[in-house]
Amino acid sequence: MFLFLSALFYLALFFVHTHFLLTYSPLVFLGLVYLLPVLFNAGVLGLQRSKNWSFLSFVQLPTFASMSYVAFAYQADATGLWEQFISLYSITDGDMTVEIAPSLLDMGQLVFMMLVYYGGALAQYGWETYKERSKKKEVTYA
């Protein structure tokens, strides 16, 4: 059930990104594209957690997030939305220059996205297993 709802969330997120990209500021873009999926995954994994959760649960959600990101990046590149976003927010002012990556599908962007999504899930998995081990150590037998 959680996986189905998560897939719907990422599908909706894809459509929101493709329709509202040009209304995002760069800070909002970073929050919605990189931070929101990590927080969403953490929330779902926290709700889903039961006695039989496994490492697989911590891989599936970042995979959905990654697929949504790649689909959005492809759509933004193919339609020219990303070029419009770049032209809106690339700034050159004297000594300072703010540049945005020419494509969301650049290798550096994809590696960063994977590190953020899977790194967040791996950190949560480590934290959850640490808590489980701590609970087992606290059990006293009479």
Report the location of each language-model feature.
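Canonical alpha-helical transmembrane segments
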Residues: 32-60
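Short, charged juxtamembrane terminal tails flanking transmembrane helices
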Residues: 1, 131-142
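Transmembrane alpha-helical segments of multi-pass membrane proteins
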Residues: 1-9, 55-74
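Alpha-helical membrane-inserting segments
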Residues: 12-17, 40, 44, 48, ...
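N-terminal signal-anchor transmembrane alpha-helix
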Residues: 1-38
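Alpha-helical membrane-associated segments of multi-pass integral membrane proteins
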Residues: 6, 86-134
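Membrane-interfacial segments
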Residues: 20, 24, 52, 127-136
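Interfacial non-cytosolic loop connecting adjacent transmembrane helices
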Residues: 19-29, 68-109
